[in-house]
Amino acid sequence: MSFNNIVTPEWLSAHLSDPTIKILDCTTYMLAQPVGPSKIESGRGQYLKGHIPGAQHVCMEKDFSEPGARFAFTVPSPDTFNRLMQRLGINHDDHVVLYGHQQMSVVTRIWFVLHAMGQRKISILNGGLALWVKSGFELSDQLPAVKTSHYKAVRRVERLADITRASEAITDPQKVLLNALKKEQFLGTGGAHYGRSGRIPNSVSWPATDLYDSQSGEFKSQDELTVLLKQLDLQPSQQVLNY
């Protein structure tokens, strides 16, 4: 079965009975603080009230970050990731569909971790839980039965940049540091920060919130995104490092 990176509620509804489709409710609330890391609140309570049938809940902080790491949201080690995927009953050949409630950045972050750790088939539900409900599809309050899998991560080290690679990119014209924070955070004029406002030198600003409609949670069309991308004046030969 082929797959798209973005799927519709109609598509997901038609594939709910497919045992190779594994649905993850990624709802996690990031509450920005004036200084320092955001306060994280689990969305499990929202999940228990009602979720897409068959979905399991995951938390970006507790499940998709390395416990005890020096910095928040550090990509998990292969061993940590293996245990998570085994607990969730996910296999390499499964098609993982992600959705959330309100904050799209949490969902895309989990998409990236799955991708970096070697999962091939990963999609995001366009519009999230809100569009699912608006489209007239049912919710469930039942916890799905899960059979433990035998997962072994294949980490794509080329998808991850450490401090050395990021530092080298500052002066390398073949690399672009792309800042996904809000414009005022990029400029250092407002918003939350980690003790020092501003950005990595020579970064380019493309706020993640420009990628989707803030009201509906749906991604902008390919034509709309192409217009935005052209404004950044990136070259196909350049390597992009996101942060």
Question: What is the predicted function of each stretch?
Answer:
Residues 1-243:
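Cytosolic catalytic domains that perform sulfur/thiol-centered chemistry
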